[in-house]
């Protein structure tokens, strides 16, 4: 089977889409009947700060970064309803999944999405003006309802960030995993292979872990340069 026919993409149905009861509409746009795409995995996630920071790491330092973290964590759309602060995370798999999904979603800016493709999902989104503490306009934040992986490299990083291997049936798991033989503990931003008072065990012998995550954990405990951040491993636990 050609590789593009087994392509995977992460989709996040964001809090503004949930607030506006657009979940059913969004899922219908990706229906297998129309796209040939299938669910590989789906879960509802209460987004912690580490997960939000890692997902939007490329935007760190930008004027809208703090607002973006509050947005994806549901604080902006559910300020007084903590139980409703969640995201629906989905892995779609199938022919040209990344390209198909991004075309259905439309431009990341809702204004541009409406102008370019009025029927796309993000055409229903909004653009929110942002102001500094003195009330000065500093730019916009796009509340665009949905996230979709931009390319194959991003899809792999994002799927491994939002999902554990055990969240995905083996027959549709796109990336290699391995069974841990060691314990790993976490406390205050640090990972160790031995228990430290106040730390907690997040991986133990017998746990199925992404192979790339295991490599990073071994790099950490051996004091070697990491392939990617500790946060990217910890955020999903």
What are these regions (language model features)?
Residues 1-237:
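Non-catalytic terminal and connector segments of soluble metabolic enzymes
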């Amino acid at each position: 089977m050609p590789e593009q026919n087994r392509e995977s993409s992460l989709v996040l149905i964001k809090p503004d889409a949930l607030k506006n009861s657009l979940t059913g509409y969004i899922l219908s746009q990706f229906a297998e009947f129309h796209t040939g795409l299938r669910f590989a995995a789906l879960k509802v996630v209460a987004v912690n700060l580490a997960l939000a920071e890692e997902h939007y790491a490329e935007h760190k330092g930008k004027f809208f970064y703090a607002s973006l973290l509050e947005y994806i964590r549901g604080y902006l759309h559910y300020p007084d309803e903590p139980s409703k602060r969640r995201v629906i995370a989905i892995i779609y798999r199938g022919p040209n999944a990344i390209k198909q999904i991004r075309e259905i979603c439309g431009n990341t800016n809702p204004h541009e999405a409406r102008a370019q493709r009025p029927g796309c999902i993000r055409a229903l989104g909004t653009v929110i003006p942002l102001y500094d503490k003195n009330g000065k306009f500093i730019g916009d934040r796009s509340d665009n309802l949905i996230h979709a992986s931009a390319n194959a490299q991003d899809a792999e990083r994002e799927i491994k960030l939002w999902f554990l291997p055990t969240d995905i049936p083996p027959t549709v798991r796109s990336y290699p995993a391995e069974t841990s033989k060691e314990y790993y503990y976490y406390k205050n931003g640090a990972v160790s292979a031995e228990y430290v008072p106040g730390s907690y065990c997040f991986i133990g012998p017998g746990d199925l872990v992404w192979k790339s995550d295991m490599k990073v954990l071994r790099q950490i405990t051996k004091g070697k340069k990491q392939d990617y951040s500790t946060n990217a491993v910890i955020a999903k636990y």
